[in-house]
Design a protein with these regions (language model features):
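N-terminal Sec-pathway targeting helices
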Residues: 7-29
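Anion-binding catalytic surfaces of enzymes that hydrolyze or transfer phosphate/sulfate esters
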Residues: 19-23, 32-36, 167-168, 174-230, ...
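Metal-dependent active-site segment of extracytoplasmic phospho-/sulfohydrolases and closely related
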Residues: 73-76, 87-91, 218-255, 277-281
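Histidine-centered active-site microenvironments of extracellular/periplasmic hydrolases
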Residues: 236, 241-263, 307-308, 433-441
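A post-motif C-terminal structural segment
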Residues: 249-252, 256-294, 298-302, 308-311, ...
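Phosphate/adenylate-binding glycine loop and adjacent helical scaffold
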Residues: 296-387, 456, 490-496
Length: 544
């Protein structure tokens, strides 16, 4: 049998050889990117682990500030209207401390967002999977939570909400919990009723109530149940934190009771909830807390403020040590030992202003080191992948010119396909999704329209292949060129997005933007899989 050789349909001049070589290279790169993306997708669906996944440190041995309250009730309302806290009669007049914050639904699934509220850690640091069913997200999370630090302090906890909180309950040592397997109005009202009975009989130190209200459903029954829960809270000894998260948009936090300074505040982040709650309870912040204490909200003296900030700095020190080691950055907390010791000495000597200022500076420097380690890891991983988008760009440009000269695909539909596939991915990458939270519904229609035009362009090209009087080999060859062209065009923004975001760090996108990016990437994945079909269609080029 003779050796395999490449059959050139139009002679053997070097432009055709070069064009065919580029096609083969693009096919190979497409297969490589498809495999990489498929691995990422499978890992994220199952159990994606960041560099800190094996870090099992806790904050139980860290110091804590003095307790400001005897009990904390944290209520999470999911799916209620954006103005629910302002217009609900059950909440009217009980407090003026309304805190605006970015939505707690800070990842692709609501469960990942609630992890941030109870642990202070982003899903990236919490060890939560990128995607997956809600009942698996909290189960896989490895971050220490308010339940753990409160139980380690010898105090009781209670949880009432959906059954997928079972992983959080299992982590707590002592918990009076009732979990509901179904969502909707009955389960939400039952959770509020169970929490109210517990607060009226033997109130725990920490009570979490999670209500998943149907989007757009009337809230009259919810108002009545919430009114009963509010009446069960004793404001002279307890504090109520109520986070209302609509289906889309900005969440609101209402706080009232002991330890709270009434007023209107802005700038609180979801990651600040856990450290602030820990300061109220007088327990250490969870070990992976990335947020800070929202001090404007708390009614405390100079000693309590200094001790709480110093305790948070100790927890953040351990996190920074593990984070810098996990990210492989050439950064170290060793040079900050002097600042750490100065804060400890100031607390021991009762110099509260000096302790507060030193803890603030230490926290800022530690956070800066972790950000620098993150950026170094991202850019370090981007460098070796820089050739990938360059190869895609060169191959796509060459194939576009070749297809235009051979009239295999009109230029206008091809450009529409580029707009449908590339611009959303690149735009989401550069903006990180922060500017589409309020216009997500309209943006979906734009994506649908552009995607429809791109699909019509591909169908038109296939119709041309069927209409022309070519033999079967010519049709296969031109179909291979068409599929390769579409795969390369759709694969270019995906390659750029993977290069920009990095494979070993978490994708920092809010929920709506993440859903849009996920939809775009899934369509791009379909285009990349079409590259494999192109390889099959190109088989007639190889003859023995």
């Amino acid at each position: 049998m003779s050796a395999m050789r490449i059959h050139l349909p139009r002679g053997g001049c070097w432009p055709h050889r070069l064009s065919l070589a580029w096609n083969i290279a693009v096919l190979a790169i497409t297969a490589f990117v498809s495999a990489v993306w498929a691995n990422i997708w499978v890992d994220s669906l199952r159990d994606y682990r960041p560099p800190l996944a094996q870090w099992d440190a806790t904050a139980s041995d860290a110091p804590a500030g003095p307790a400001l309250i005897e009990g904390l009730v944290l209520v999470l309302l999911e799916g209620v209207p954006a103005d629910y806290l302002d217009r609900t009669p059950a909440l009217a007049g009980i407090s003026a401390a309304h805190v605006r914050m970015t939505g707690p639904l800070s990842s692709y699934t609501p469960a990942s967002g609630w992890i941030t509220l109870v642990s202070g850690a982003s899903p990236r640091l919490a060890g939560a999977p990128l995607q997956g069913a809600a009942d698996s997200v909290l189960w896989y999370a490895r971050a220490e939570t308010l339940f753990d630090v409160t139980a380690d302090a010898g105090r009781q906890t209670a949880l009432y909400g959906p059954v997928w909180w079972r992983g959080m309950v299992a982590a707590a040592k002592r918990s009076e919990s009732v979990l509901f397997g179904s969502a909707g109005e009955p389960a939400a009202l039952a959770a509020l009723a169970e929490a109210r009975r517990q607060l009226e009989s033997q109130p725990p130190a920490l009570t979490l109530v999670h209500v998943r209200w149907p989007d757009g459903f009337p809230t009259a029954s919810l108002d009545d149940a919430l009114r009963g829960l509010v009446r069960a809270v004793e404001p002279s000894r307890q504090t109520l934190l109520l986070a209302a998260a609509p289906a889309r948009g900005t969440a609101r936090l209402m706080a009232f009771g002991c330890g709270i300074r009434p007023g209107a505040y802005t700038g609180m982040r979801p990651a600040d909830i856990a450290p602030t709650a820990a300061a109220l309870l007088g327990v250490p912040a969870p070990a992976r807390s990335e947020g800070t204490i929202f001090r404007s909200l708390l009614a405390w003296d100079a000693e309590a403020e200094a001790r709480s900030l110093a305790a948070l700095a100790e927890v953040r020190w351990k996190l920074a040590e593990a984070y810098l080691a996990g990210m492989g950055a050439s950064l170290d907390v060793g040079p900050l030992l002097g600042e750490r010791e100065a804060v400890r000495q100031a607390v021991g000597a009762g110099r509260w202003p000096a302790a507060r200022e030193g803890a603030e500076k230490l926290l800022a420097v530690l956070d800066g080191l972790m950000r620098e380690a993150y950026h170094r890891r991202v850019w370090g991983d981007r460098l070796w992948r820089l050739w990938l988008p360059i190869m895609y760009l060169a191959g796509a440009i060459l194939m576009q010119g070749r297809a235009w000269r051979r009239k295999e695909l009109p230029l206008a539909p091809a450009l529409i396909t580029v707009a449908a596939a590339g611009l959303p991915a690149v735009w989401l990458t550069l903006s990180r999704g922060t500017r589409i939270l309020e216009s997500f519904a309209g943006w979906q229609w734009v994506l649908a329209g552009l995607g429809a035009w791109g699909t019509l362009a591909g169908l038109w090209g296939m119709w041309v292949l069927r209409r022309e009087s070519w033999d079967i080999w010519e049709r296969w060859r031109r179909a291979a060129g068409l599929v390769q062209l579409l795969a390369a065009i759709w694969g270019l923004p995906l390659a750029f997005l993977m290069w920009w975001q990095g494979l070993v760090v978490w994708w920092d996108l809010p929920a709506p933007a993440g859903a849009a990016a996920q939809a775009v990437l899934l369509t791009q994945l379909a285009g990349l899989c079409a590259g494999g079909l192109a390889g099959i269609l190109a088989a007639p080029f190889l003859k023995s």
